[in-house]
Swiss-Prot record:
Associates with the RNA exosome complex. RNA-binding protein that associates with the RNA exosome complex. Involved in surveillance of pre-rRNAs and pre-mRNAs, and the degradation of cryptic non-coding RNAs (ncRNA) derived from intergenic regions and the ribosomal DNA spacer heterochromatin. Residues 168-186 have a biased composition (Basic residues). The gene is MPP6. This is M-phase phosphoprotein 6 homolog. Keywords: Acetylation, Nucleus, Phosphoprotein, RNA-binding, rRNA processing. Disruption phenotype: Lethal in combination with the absence of either RRP6 or its cofactor RRP47. Weak but detectable stabilization of unspliced pre-mRNAs, and stronger stabilization is detected for mRNAs with defects in 3' cleavage and polyadenylation. Residues 22-47, 95-186 are annotated as: Disordered. It comes from Saccharomyces cerevisiae (strain ATCC 204508 / S288c) (Baker's yeast). Belongs to the MPP6 family. Residues 122-147 have a biased composition (Basic and acidic residues). GO terms for molecular function: poly(U) RNA binding; protein-containing complex binding.
Length: 186
């Protein structure tokens, strides 16, 4: 390819901006070469006066000059902020993190509380009440066994299982008999 041919294809916006900046610089050089009276004096004038007359030219993309301008304007150099890096703590592993474990009321006495009573007395009362309930439950279980007779749990399960299987067999025989009747009617 020859150098005279233009660039074909799409150019990115950065490349296009660089091209325009290049053309802007060449235009400035050509205008400074002309012999107009304002341009003759412009070589002598400092940059600050140009900035006052024409405003700052933002087309120049020079970050260092921008920082220098900021230093001149503010009169102070900006301090660099030191970043403090904190070391991350190791993760704590907790074994019981379930909802019921987290919501467990610790030190809370469930039930009614009368004002003016000591908490120690109410705790001992509660323990006595719980023990009384357990004794009553044991007594009920003993009475139930006496009433029903001394059957073991294994025998009860065997009887229930046998009844269940018999009921399933009856349902199957009834269902098959109905299907035979329907087929014969058709």
């Amino acid at each position: 390819m020859s150098a005279n041919n233009g660039v074909t294809g799409k150019l990115s916006s950065r490349v296009m901006n660089m091209k325009f900046m290049k053309f802007g610089k060449t235009d400035d050089e050509e205008s400074s070469n002309s012999n107009t009276p304002s341009n003759i004096n412009s070589d002598v004038e400092p940059i600050e006066q140009k900035g006052k007359l024409f405003g700052l030219d933002d087309s120049a993309w020079d970050l260092n000059s921008y920082k220098d301008d900021l230093k001149k304007i503010s009169g102070k150099e900006k301090k660099k902020v030191k970043r403090v890096v904190y070391k991350k703590r190791p993760n704590l592993i907790i074994s019981n993190v379930g909802y019921s474990e987290l919501r467990k009321p610790e030190g809370v006495i469930s039930g009614r509380k009368t004002f003016g009573d000591n908490s120690d007395d109410s705790g001992s009362r509660k323990r006595k009440f719980d023990e009384g309930e357990q004794n009553e439950d044991e007594k009920r279980d003993a009475k139930d066994k006496e009433f029903t007779g001394s059957q073991d749990d294994g025998e009860d399960e065997y009887d229930l299982d046998k009844l269940f299987k018999d009921s399933i067999k009856k349902k199957k025989t009834n269902h098959n008999g109905k299907n035979k009747n329907r087929n014969s009617k058709k």
